[in-house]
């Protein structure tokens, strides 16, 4: 019995030793895989992505804050604070001042928009000239047309027959509405025909 127990213990020890070897090989292989992946492991990638998103969100908030400050500054410049008005003369003076400012701003706006239109036209002309020199021409954008729409149009045309409204009218033999010129032409012959 001791031989059987010893033999069984030896087999168990052999199995344990083989399991340990397999475990070591798997650990070695996993270490090799990690070593091959390089510096950026999935955890590091996730952390880096999170940091980048936080930085981008912070930058976006900063930009929005700067834009809002710029907007407030410009509004403070442009908006004239209304004074306390005691009588009509003060009101007319404020009205005249605001009207003059409005006229100035509108004329500036018109001048700027005119310059922009001129520049756009010039840019377009130069683009056309460059394309002509290169030999490249701008292809016009085509509208998308569905195939089924054309088929439906053909079916509608076949179904819709021409309606002749004159056929429904009553025939009148009187020549009340006929022109008199036709009768005179028949009676009178041309000078050369005589």
Swiss-Prot record:
Region (Disordered): 1-27
Any one GO molecular-function label of the UniProt entry: actin binding
Tissue distribution: Expression is detected only in pharyngeal muscle cells from embryos to adults.
One CC-aspect GO term: sarcomere
InterPro entries xref list: Troponin, Troponin_I, Troponin_sf
Example GO BP: nematode pharyngeal pumping
Keywords: Actin-binding, Muscle protein
Keyword Iron: no
Disruption phenotype: Worms exhibit developmental arrest at gastrulation.
Keyword Metal-binding: no
Composition bias type Basic and acidic residues, residue spans: 7-27
Superkingdom of the source species: Eukaryota
Family: Belongs to the troponin I family.
Record function comment: Troponin I is the inhibitory subunit of troponin, the thin filament regulatory complex which confers calcium-sensitivity to muscle actomyosin ATPase activity.
Full protein name: Troponin I 4
Organism from which the protein derives: Caenorhabditis elegans
């Amino acid at each position: 019995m001791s031989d059987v127990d010893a033999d069984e213990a030896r087999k168990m020890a052999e199995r344990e030793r083989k399991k340990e070897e397999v475990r070591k090989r798997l650990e070695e292989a996993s270490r090799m895989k990690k070593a091959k992946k390089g510096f950026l492991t999935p955890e590091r990638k996730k952390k880096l992505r999170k940091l980048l998103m936080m930085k981008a969100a912070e930058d976006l908030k900063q930009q929005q804050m700067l834009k809002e400050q710029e907007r407030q500054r410009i509004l403070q410049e442009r908006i004239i604070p209304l004074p306390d008005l005691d009588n009509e003369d003060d009101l007319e003076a404020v009205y005249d001042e605001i009207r003059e400012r409005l006229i100035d701003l509108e004329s500036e706006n018109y001048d700027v928009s005119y310059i922009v239109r001129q520049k756009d036209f010039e840019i377009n002309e130069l683009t056309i000239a460059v394309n002509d020199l290169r030999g490249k021409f701008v292809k016009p954008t085509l509208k998308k047309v569905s195939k089924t729409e054309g088929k439906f149009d053909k079916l509608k045309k076949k179904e819709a027959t021409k309606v002749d409204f004159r056929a429904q009218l009553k025939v009148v033999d009187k020549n009340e509405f006929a022109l008199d010129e036709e009768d005179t032409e028949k009676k009178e012959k041309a000078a050369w025909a005589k």
